[in-house]
Amino acid sequence: MKSLKELSLRIKNIRSVQKTTKIMQMVSAAKLLQSQKKLLNSKLYVSKLHNIIFSLMLSVDQELLAKILNVSNDGSYLVFIIASDRGLCGNFNSSIVKFSQERVNKSIANGKKVDIVFLGKKAFDVGKNRFDSKSILKIENSKGITLKHVEALVDGIDLSKYDKVKVFYSKFYNTFTQKPMLETIKPWSKDSSLIDSSLAGPTTDYGYEYEPQNIEFILKSLVQDYVVIALYSALLESATSENSARMVAMESANRNTKEILNKLALLYNRSRQAAITTDLIEVIGGAESL
């Protein structure tokens, strides 16, 4: 049995850890509320933009539409993998890397050239040796990236040389549910995991008046804008999922430390009682020998 001094020191250390996890849980809860508000605004915007693009496409013939979307199965892919810069959030980082690894390596095995951009230090640390791609870029502080940063990032990449641009991210459903998701943001698709149909409104041709009166120019511009907005929205989804995962992980850690402290307190009291009993026996034994 451990000494009272050892047990006392261990209880002190675990209480210190418990204070840290409680603070981290509170901070994560506050960040979760903030990121949820940003995510809702972003989801509203991307849903409306997606709906406008689809509505405009209703008035475009298929030949022009194919030209605007530039759909092709050849060439190369650009893949964004979004995770976190920090740990202590359960399997948040490992799950998105595992999810993307299977799909990216399958594309490479099928002869596709895939360039990878890791948005988040942990995504790079976990996944840098798991992908068969030789072209890998790492961008840290993904959760702090603003819309301007995303615009600069996209502007710095020649998207025209990629037939497909894909985003792997963690979709936020609720506090306890976040799932790895794959979203293709180029070419534009009618189906999207980033939009909320209840926010987008009805899909119909509203009879827009175009300025300039060149629907091809307008659609190309909107589709390019959609790539930026969709990537930014995916970043917000992942940031919200990360904060939620960390809050839940810290809550679980708090419960575990509480259970450990209860067990240690019980063990400490038993050890203390045993020590007192031993001392009493020695005192009584000494008195009887007199």
Curated annotation (Swiss-Prot):
Q: Which Gene3D superfamilies match?
A: 3.40.1380.10, ATP synthase, gamma subunit, helix hairpin domain
Keywords recorded for this protein, A-Z: ATP synthesis, Cell membrane, CF(1), Hydrogen ion transport, Ion transport, Membrane, Transport
Membrane as a keyword of this entry, yes or no, is yes
Location of the protein in the cell: Cell membrane
UniProt GO molecular function: ATP binding; proton-transporting ATP synthase activity, rotational mechanism
Q: Where are the transmembrane segments?
A: none
Task: Please cite one Gene Ontology biological process associated with this protein.
Answer: proton motive force-driven plasma membrane ATP synthesis
The record, for InterPro entries, names: ATP_synth_F1_ATPase_gsu (IPR035968), ATP_synth_F1_gsu (IPR000131)
A GO CC term assigned to this protein in UniProt: proton-transporting ATP synthase complex
User: Membrane topology per the record?
Assistant: Peripheral membrane protein
Protein role: Produces ATP from ADP in the presence of a proton gradient across the membrane. The gamma chain is believed to be important in regulating ATPase activity and the flow of protons through the CF(0) complex.
Q: Which family does it belong to?
A: Belongs to the ATPase gamma chain family.
- Share what the entry says about its subunit structure, partners included: F-type ATPases have 2 components, CF(1) - the catalytic core - and CF(0) - the membrane proton channel. CF(1) has five subunits: alpha(3), beta(3), gamma(1), delta(1), epsilon(1). CF(0) has three main subunits: a, b and c.
User: Which HAMAP family does this UniProt record tie to the protein?
Assistant: ATP_synth_gamma_bact
- The entry's protein name is ATP synthase gamma chain
Gene it is expressed from? atpG
